[in-house]
């Protein structure tokens, strides 16, 4: 009989119950006991949903109040010593301080979990880091599930992945792999505690096996699993997010009891494990996207495996279902307005039922679930033939693109002359990244408009009032190139998705980004085009209020792609180019309307990098082409800006230069301009605006701090190509600190301009 198991479930609840309880607790509106009760209820519901799918093992240990890697830092005693906390007796209050900071210590750094949109808290490892076991978190969840009469499988991220996703800190140089001999006995203690609590199987996840691991890290797997296998539980080694076929010989030799492989991201993997003689768990339902599976097709893959493996075949989702929204059945608006699209989707609860059907088909024959298989096939056929998805005009436009369709008319050296001729900017021109504070009044007006409580005319008047205020304040500050402040935008991707064809939105399709923060990604279900202008009216209104240049503001094609649930029936590169052409229509309309400085934001370019470096070039080529397509056809005198906010550029600088934006603004203040050194060494050819203060904090920088950063920038970038701007958009700031921060930036700029003029 084939076994069905789960690796992880969304933590936040169907209606973000955990988020609201956490935030109430932080505001001291509920007690710790009340928060714990909400969490316990959510865990029980999650397990019951898994049990309702006929799961042989429910997942435990995956639920967390903030992040599973933070839980692991606590469980191994690896919390940062700078907090002065005792990991053995950590209070919930202290746990949250690790994640959110306190008056004495900044929060643990966050970054994206592999190539997902989930953020984990990065372990801080020092040469002298000591580890200490505390298995309470995992044991408690195991016992709770057992008390409900369920068979449970604890899931723990493995020691090598734990070390891999951490960072080396401190003055002493060392390799974090050298901590393994100290860490391994602690893992043995944690696993032993789980065995004593009744765990039969334990899943140890090692997604690091899907990235380019150095040889010594790969070799370390032998010793690690030789040690861990001495614990008397059965070990299922979990891999996901990519192929581990290159490590097949190693994985077959490891003394574990089973292996989980991701057949959604890497469907070719069964060939590499055809002779595997232990449990082989195959992830056949997509844990990262929202499309219903064609179950007949899945069975065509899995039935031959069952014939070969018999009882050694296990099935599951490709990875934890953490990355998918909770329940499609509550999406009543989507069902009413787009019934076909609704029938093509599967959220977490629907995916559990897909796995139930697959298990029944494998164990009792396809006839036992003939009705469900027929419904799955009907949905797949409907999607394949839908005119809502496949549009001949969009396909023709892409097919007819000439070879150099993504190129500007002239090289940068010619364009910059044409731009300066009319812009006539001073040395060190100043600008903002885009957004200004989204006040309560703005949010209330938008909410009222969406509910039909505010007319379109009144909403437009309210937004125009905000735009006028933003323009007036920038003029008072004497900024050179202005922005309209984006008052009308709820979110930099959702705003455009609502105005482009091929996009749809959910009411409750929330997924956890980090901690209590959830995002509701748009769904790109069909060919993308732009029915009408999206930003022209707002930008031209803003331009009418000032003689200074006004920036048009667009979100770039790669970022829209990265922050959405993307259709899986055509290549992502094709979807991205469709978005780029839709944006190009907007760029040319802005230009026609007199907006001659246009920013196309691409904060997510780096996030899209494949896990394996061998795949980088292909991605960077189509990502760069998409960006260039979005601005192609502009006059030389139109200045194209882009903005990027992340800290690792060095390895992709040639690709960023190839995007050929006239001006790039980047987030650099928190790294003390270190990032800029890479641009200097690379001799980045176009204009550049490094952020001179950190907008993520309400703190107003001193003039000395901003001057220090700007002087560092002048050392690296030719002053005639240097812009001055904040790190990022100002959406999350209050007005008071925004104006004070910008005033400091302007004072320093004026001082250095005077100095440079001498």
Swiss-Prot record:
NCBIfam families: met_syn_B12ind, PRK05222.1
GO BP of this protein: methionine biosynthetic process; methylation
Binding site for Zn(2+): 643, 645, 667, 728
Pathway: Amino-acid biosynthesis; L-methionine biosynthesis via de novo pathway; L-methionine from L-homocysteine (MetE route): step 1/1
EC number from the UniProt entry: 2.1.1.14
Name of this chain's protein: 5-methyltetrahydropteroyltriglutamate--homocysteine methyltransferase
Family note: Belongs to the vitamin-B12 independent methionine synthase family.
Catalytic activity reported: 5-methyltetrahydropteroyltri-L-glutamate + L-homocysteine = tetrahydropteroyltri-L-glutamate + L-methionine
Positions of the catalytic residues: 696
Gene assigned in the entry: metE
Residues at which L-methionine binds: 433-435, 486, 601
Cofactor note: Binds 1 zinc ion per subunit.
Domain of life the protein comes from: Bacteria
Binding site residues for L-homocysteine: 433-435, 486, 601
Cofactor (UniProt): Zn(2+)
């Amino acid at each position: 009989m084939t076994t069905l198991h789960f690796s992880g479930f969304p933590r936040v609840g169907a209606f973000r119950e955990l988020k609201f309880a956490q935030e109430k607790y932080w505001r001291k509106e509920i007690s710790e006991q009340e928060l714990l009760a909400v969490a316990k209820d959510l865990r029980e519901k999650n397990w019951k949903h898994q049990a309702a799918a006929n799961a042989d093992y429910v997942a435990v240990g995956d639920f967390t109040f903030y992040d599973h890697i933070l839980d692991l830092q606590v469980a191994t005693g690896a919390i940062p010593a700078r907090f002065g906390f005792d990991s053995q007796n950590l209070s919930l209050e202290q746990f949250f301080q690790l994640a959110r900071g306190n008056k004495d210590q900044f929060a643990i750094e966050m970054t994206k979990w592999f190539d997902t949109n989930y953020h984990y808290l990065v372990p801080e490892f020092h040469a002298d880091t000591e580890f200490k076991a505390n298995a309470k978190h995992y044991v408690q969840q195991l016992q709770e599930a057992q008390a409900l009469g369920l068979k449970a499988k604890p899931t723990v991220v493995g020691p090598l992945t734990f070390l891999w996703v951490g960072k080396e800190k401190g003055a002493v140089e060392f390799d974090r792999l050298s901590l393994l001999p100290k860490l391994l006995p602690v893992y043995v203690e944690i696993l032993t505690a789980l065995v004593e609590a009744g765990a039969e199987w334990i899943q140890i996840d090692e997604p690091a096996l899907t990235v380019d691991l150095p040889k010594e890290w790969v070799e370390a797997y032998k010793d690690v699993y030789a040690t861990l296998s001495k614990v008397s539980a059965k070990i299922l080694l979990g891999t996901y997010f990519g192929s581990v076929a290159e490590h097949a010989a190693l994985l077959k030799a490891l003394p574990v009891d089973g292996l989980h492989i991701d057949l959604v991201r890497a469907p070719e993997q069964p060939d590499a494990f055809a002779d595997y003689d232990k449990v082989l768990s195959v992830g056949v339902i997509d844990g990262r996207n929202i499309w219903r599976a064609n179950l007949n097709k899945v069975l065509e893959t899995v039935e031959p495996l069952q014939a070969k493996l018999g009882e050694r075949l296990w099935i599951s989702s490709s990875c934890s279902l953490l990355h998918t929204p909770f329940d499609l059945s509550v999406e009543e608006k989507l069902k009413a307005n787009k019934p076909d699209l609704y029938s093509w989707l599967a959220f977490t609860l629907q995916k559990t039922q897909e796995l139930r059907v697959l298990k029944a088909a494998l164990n009792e024959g396809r006839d036992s679930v003939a009705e469900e298989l027929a419904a799955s096939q009907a949905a797949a056929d409907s999607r394949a033939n839908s005119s809502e998805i496949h549009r001949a005009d969009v396909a023709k436009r892409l097919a007819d693109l000439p070879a150099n369709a993504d190129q500007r008319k002239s090289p940068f050296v010619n364009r910059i002359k044409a731009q300066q001729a009319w812009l006539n900017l001073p040395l060190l021109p100043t600008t903002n990244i885009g957004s200004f504070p989204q006040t309560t009044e703005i949010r209330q007006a938008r909410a009222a408009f969406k509910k039909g409580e505010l007319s379109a005319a009144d909403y437009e008047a309210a937004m125009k009032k905000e735009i006028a205020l933003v323009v007036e304040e920038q003029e008072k500050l004497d900024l050179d190139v202005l922005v309209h402040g984006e008052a009308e935008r709820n979110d930099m991707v959702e705003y455009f998705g609502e105005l482009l064809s091929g996009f749809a939105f959910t009411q409750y399709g929330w997924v956890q980004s980090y901690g209590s923060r959830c995002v509701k990604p748009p769904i790109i279900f069909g060919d993308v085009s732009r029915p009408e202008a999206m930003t022209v009216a707002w930008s031209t209104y803003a331009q009418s209020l000032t003689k200074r240049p006004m920036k048009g503001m667009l979100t770039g094609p790669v970022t829209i792609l990265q922050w959405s649930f993307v259709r899986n029936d055509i290549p992502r590169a094709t979807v991205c180019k469709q978005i780029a052409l839709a944006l190009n229509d907007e760029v040319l309309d802005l230009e026609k309307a007199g907006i001659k400085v246009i920013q196309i934001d691409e904060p997510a370019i780096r996030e899209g990098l494949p896990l394996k470096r061998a795949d980088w070039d292909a991605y960077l080529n189509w990502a760069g082409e998409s960006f260039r397509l979005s601005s192609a056809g502009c006059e030389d005198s139109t200045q194209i800006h882009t903005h990027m906010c992340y800290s690792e550029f060095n390895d992709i600088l040639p690709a960023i230069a190839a995007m050929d934006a006239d001006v790039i603004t980047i987030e650099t203040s928190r790294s003390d301009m270190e990032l800029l050194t890479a641009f200097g060494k690379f001799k980045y050819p176009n204009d550049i605006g490094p952020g001179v203060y950190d907008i993520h904090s309400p703190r107003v920088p001193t003039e000395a701090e901003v001057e220090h950063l700007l002087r560092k920038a002048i050392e690296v970038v030719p002053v005639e190509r240097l812009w001055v701007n904040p790190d990022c958009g100002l959406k999350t700031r209050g007005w008071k600190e925004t104006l004070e921060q910008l005033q400091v930036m302007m004072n320093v700029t004026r001082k250095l301009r005077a100095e440079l003029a001498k």
